[in-house]
Amino acid sequence: MTNLSIHNFKLSLVAAVIGSAMVMTSSPVAAQQAMQPMQSMKIERGTILTQPGVFGVFTMFKLRPDWNKVPVAERKGAAEEVKKLIEKHKDNVLVDLYLTRGLETNSDFFFRINAYDLAKAQTFMREFRSTTVGKNADVFETLVGVTKPLNYISKDKSPGLNAGLSSATYSGPAPRYVIVIPVKKNAEWWNMSPEERLKEMEVHTTPTLAYLVNVKRKLYHSTGLDDTDFITYFETDDLTAFNNLMLSLAQVKENKFHVRWGSPTTLGTIHSPEDVIKALAD
């Protein structure tokens, strides 16, 4: 495979998740309402992960070499320390922690924080840096985005594909793997008409429908909040299916609108936060 084809191959994956989940509010009033922090709402996983107006913070960490010099008792106690911190903030943020050690060069673990109020996520991450493991790790990458309601592949604009997306439910085993890919579009994309972008999204969504039973996906918008436009988040138990998804999208020409795809692409495994820290303490 040539360098160019490899590049095109990588740039094409996010078409589906952007096609199926790229969103913006339909009016300024709706946008303002969607973005209002819902401070009075209790954090419930099944709710916050399906709502618009939710901020997502992804922070990748690399443990320092001196971590191995920390006394074993302190390293073992770090898991309980992080568990207590998560419990302290459970009414303000939803915390997921993933293990990347052994799969990535530049990180050992990363957080995904979902919050109605971005400042609450910032407070959690600031306090994490004061924990035993937080004081012995350096930030490699931070990505910030927000969820929005469907815009392109919606019932009114693309009813056929919307029905296909709605009926394609994940049916595989509990996902063991997580992949995070940041994406940035070029000026040509943003200067296209909404109708032109809709057409592109329909073309790119079609070949992905067969893989939605194997791959979960979620989209965060980050234009103006970060140096990228989208954060694409995937969960799967079948990395071969995920690879085949990429191969199917390699034939789609939408990658000409990307100026960033990955850099980094982060692959990790899914565990409880406590188990991630325990694994790093060994």
UniProtKB/Swiss-Prot annotation:
Enzyme class label: oxidoreductase
EC number: 1.13.11.49
Annotated signal peptide: 1-31
Assigned GO CC terms: periplasmic space
The keyword Heme appears for this protein: yes
Matches recorded under SUPFAM superfamilies: Dimeric alpha+beta barrel
Subcellular location: Periplasm
Known cofactor(s): heme b
Active-site residues, Swiss-Prot/TrEMBL: R217
Keyword DNA damage in annotation: no
Gene3D superfamilies (UniProt xref): 3.30.70.3420
Pfam families noted in UniProt: Chlor_dismutase
Function noted in UniProt: Catalyzes the heme-dependent decomposition of chlorite to O(2) and chloride with high efficiency and specificity. Used to detoxify chlorite, a by-product of the reduction of perchlorate, a primarily anthropogenic pollutant, in perchlorate-respiring bacteria.
Family: Belongs to the chlorite dismutase family.
Name of the protein in question: Chlorite dismutase
